[in-house]
Amino acid sequence: MKVTLPEFERAGVMVVGDVMLDRYWYGPTSRISPEAPVPVVKVNTIEERPGGAANVAMNIASLGANARLVGLTGIDDAARALSKSLADVNVKCDFVSVPTHPTITKLRVLSRNQQLIRLDFEEGFEGVDPQPLHERINQALSSIGALVLSDYAKGALASVQQMIQLARKAGVPVLIDPKSTDFERYRGATLLTPNLSEFEAVVGKCKTEEEIVERGMKLIADYELSALLVTRSEQGMSLLQPGKAPLHMPTQAQEVYDVTGAGDTVIGVLAATLAAGNSLEEACFFANAAAGVVVGKLGTSTVSPIELENAVRGRADTGFGVMTEEELKLAVAAARKRGEKVVMTNGVFDILHAGHVSYLANARKLGDRLIVAVNSDASTKRLKGDSRPVNPLEQRMIVLGALEAVDWVVSFEEDTPQRLIAGILPDLLVKGGDYKPEEIAGSKEVWANGGEVLVLNFEDGCSTTNIIKKIQQDKKG
């Protein structure tokens, strides 16, 4: 179906809450420590990502919306790393620095796609003067379409009731991802987004969907909420509003690798969609699709517009289909963290025929993901002559992306995809025809990275050139 995404570029959202830095240490394990019965991890990769409220802001910015972030940090390396990472993804930060406290940091050690341990460095910000936070909210209210209060129970939202009142007085919707079981703190909010366990911690165990609805509607009435969205993991999510029938949305996740930060993605997409002028029902639709994408990634992650569009078209994953080069690199990185083997091939694919389909199916069988790099129209013309391509690039890529064997499609402008291949570095590079492996563009780079290069045979009797000739002959006849 044709999907029209919200106009995220005109959406302004402020996020206020508990910001933190997520650190990831990756490496192989091959032995047990002689000091204790624990694995020894040889760390070879270190990553730092914004977490908590900062991850919410990143999710908003990744959609192309204007994201502002307010929170409490220390004056330390973690705060500086947070600021730099967020500036790099167009999040405008306005942190309140507290010299007596460290920036909240969570360190995770992973090996073989498993998290071995998490170490938390924090003291919490309870008792810190909230007035600087209130001032920042007041200054922004005239230029934002939604306020997100991201509560991780670390102290930044100690004065959450005053924050809600400031926004409601200005007519700005307030969305809250709650951590406290004392929902009195959130009285008057526009929307609360508890997950099922958080919801049941307040209302008690719910055995049926009807109980969720009944108790949820009572919460709305008791705490003067405008709406309640209960995220229910593999059961999807349920939107409850006074005077309206419940809206239950099934999950769109196809593969679940990590639920870290999924709630951040949900509330981020909700806020950006509402701030863009869409209805709450539409916002929930897009948020549900985004959640299905992000749980297929490892660690706190964001969703790009093309991933979201692919997801609402029913292809939720790491972003199937046509991609830009940068989006492809992110998708490949996510696949590698899951231990998947990436195969790559390239060609013009002007008039797709049975030989192409058979070749691509065979290439896909050699790994877990298949990338098809396609010559641009200008590149094709230089390679094949002025009469080619018959089909423009966009149409060629759409057809390729619809094939079951193909995961990702990307274009390149040069005569060969050598630069593109060098940037992706697939585990296996394949090419059809009578080439020698060393003649294939990108082979040297793939070999140098420890990858493989393989030549596959095309199906006999299938040729785009022959198809074009036959069409021309039929026209003459």
Curated annotation (Swiss-Prot):
GO biological process terms, alphabetically, are: ADP-L-glycero-beta-D-manno-heptose biosynthetic process
CDD domains reported for this sequence? RfaE_like
Region span, Cytidylyltransferase: 344-477
Residues forming the catalytic site: 264
- State the EC number(s): 2.7.1.167, 2.7.7.70
* N6-acetyllysine modification, residue list: 179
Pathway field of the UniProt record reads: Nucleotide-sugar biosynthesis; ADP-L-glycero-beta-D-manno-heptose biosynthesis; ADP-L-glycero-beta-D-manno-heptose from D-glycero-beta-D-manno-heptose 7-phosphate: step 1/4; Nucleotide-sugar biosynthesis; ADP-L-glycero-beta-D-manno-heptose biosynthesis; ADP-L-glycero-beta-D-manno-heptose from D-glycero-beta-D-manno-heptose 7-phosphate: step 3/4
Query: What one GO molecular function would you report for this record?
Result: heptose 7-phosphate kinase activity
* Binding-site residues, ATP: 195-198
Extract the ranges annotated as region (Ribokinase): 1-318
Which PROSITE patterns does this UniProt record tie to the protein?
Answer: PFKB_KINASES_1 (PS00583)
The catalysed reaction is: D-glycero-beta-D-manno-heptose 7-phosphate + ATP = D-glycero-beta-D-manno-heptose 1,7-bisphosphate + ADP + H(+); D-glycero-beta-D-manno-heptose 1-phosphate + ATP + H(+) = ADP-D-glycero-beta-D-manno-heptose + diphosphate
Could you name the Gene Ontology cellular component terms for this entry? cytosol
Q: Where are the annotated coiled coils located?
A: none
Q: What class of enzyme is it?
A: transferase
Q: Which UniProt keywords apply?
A: Acetylation, ATP-binding, Carbohydrate metabolism, Kinase, Multifunctional enzyme, Nucleotide-binding, Nucleotidyltransferase, Transferase
- Its family? In the N-terminal section; belongs to the carbohydrate kinase PfkB family.
Q: Describe, as the record does, how this protein assembles with itself and its partners.
A: Homodimer.
Q: What does this protein do?
A: Catalyzes the ADP transfer from ATP to D-glycero-beta-D-manno-heptose 1-phosphate, yielding ADP-D-glycero-beta-D-manno-heptose.
Q: Which PANTHER family match?
A: BIFUNCTIONAL PROTEIN HLDE (PTHR46969:SF1)
**HAMAP family, per this entry?**
HldE
Looking up NCBIfam families in the UniProt record yields: cyt_tran_rel (TIGR00125), PRK11316.1 (NF008454), rfaE_dom_I (TIGR02198), rfaE_dom_II (TIGR02199)
Q: What protein does this entry describe?
A: Bifunctional protein HldE
Lineage start: Bacteria, Pseudomonadati, Pseudomonadota, Gammaproteobacteria, Enterobacterales
